[in-house]
From Swiss-Prot:
One of its GO terms (biological process) is fatty acid biosynthetic process. It comes from Arabidopsis thaliana. Its main location: plastid. This is Biotin carboxyl carrier protein of acetyl-CoA carboxylase 1, chloroplastic. It comes from the Eukaryota. GO terms for cellular component: acetyl-CoA carboxylase complex; chloroplast; chloroplast envelope; chloroplast stroma; plastid. The keyword Lipid metabolism applies.
Length: 280
């Protein structure tokens, strides 16, 4: 195989081109050389190069003032599609590489929107705990009410503390009987109030007209209004009943002698509770 080069140099008037073609022994040609002449513009410089190829031979043709080289056109045709195919493959690779990333970003954004809607749903409803599973992802939304575990140990500790005073209270009653021993002497020292007790049902009583707290004296530290055995007149003040932070004086509705004081000083009384037993 051999290569051929063609160079054309023309003066201002005209130029001549010599084209020599070489062929192999396999393809015999009768006329081995031809002469082609045509006019060119001022001072053109043209150079035609053809590289050796195993499958084709350089051929120069001149038809209607046009020169074409088969080898160079073939080379252009071969180079063009190969570069286009390479670009297409690269673009496919880039698109295939970027498509999964876009898919994952879209799925993540959709999942986040679902999470926000679920959080709003839990806040607006009486839902304590919500669990969501999607593909390989698991989401759990819990309120503070669903986490009572840290408070449970504190409650057990508080339950143990009241138990200790209870034992002390149980141990205290044995000392009370010793102090209760002198108590029997007090009932013995007050025999007079005991006789009228059987006749209480038949004697008239002064009842409380309202609910409140019963007080025998007008103020703390002062002597009581009446005592057992005192004679009272109708309309005389016997005690005070505090109701709604008001001190209400209770008067006797008849004249007589105070036989018994039923209510206890400083204790609450209800409506129509007997306060005194007054014998006419």
């Amino acid at each position: 195989m051999a290569s051929s080069s063609f160079s054309v140099t023309s003066p201002a008037a005209a130029a001549s081109v010599y084209a020599v073609t070489q062929t192999s022994s396999h393809f015999p040609i009768q006329n081995r050389s031809r002469r082609v002449s045509f006019r060119l513009s001022a001072k053109p410089k043209l150079r035609f190069l053809s590289k050796p190829s195993r499958s084709s031979y350089p051929v120069v043709k001149a038809q209607s003032n046009k020169v074409s080289t088969g080898a160079s056109s073939n080379a252009a045709k071969v180079d063009g599609p190969s570069s286009a195919e390479g670009k297409e493959k690269n673009s496919l690779k880039e698109s295939s590489a970027s498509s999964p990333e876009l898919a994952t970003e879209e799925s993540i954004s959709e999942f986040l929107t679902q999470v926000t809607t679920l959080v709003k749903l839990v806040d607006s409803r009486d839902i304590v705990e919500l669990q969501l599973k999607q593909l390989d992802c698991e989401l759990v939304i819990r309120k503070k009410e669903a986490l009572p575990q840290p408070q449970a140990p504190a409650s057990y500790v508080m339950m143990q503390q009241p138990n200790q005073p209870s034992y002390a209270q149980q141990m205290a009653p044995p000392a009370a009987p010793a102090a209760a021993a002198p108590a029997p002497s007090t009932p013995a020292s007050l025999p007079p109030p005991s006789p009228p007790t059987p006749a209480k049902s038949s004697l008239p009583t002064v009842k409380s007209p309202m609910a409140g707290t019963f007080y025998r004296s007008p103020a703390p530290g002062e002597p009581p209004f009446i005592k057992v055995g005192d004679k009272v007149q109708k309309g005389q003040v016997l005690c005070i009943v505090e109701a709604m932070k008001l001190m209400n004086e209770i008067e006797s509705d008849h004249t007589g002698t105070v036989v018994d004081i039923v209510a206890e000083d400083g204790k609450p009384v209800s409506l129509d509770t007997p306060l005194f037993v007054v014998q006419p």
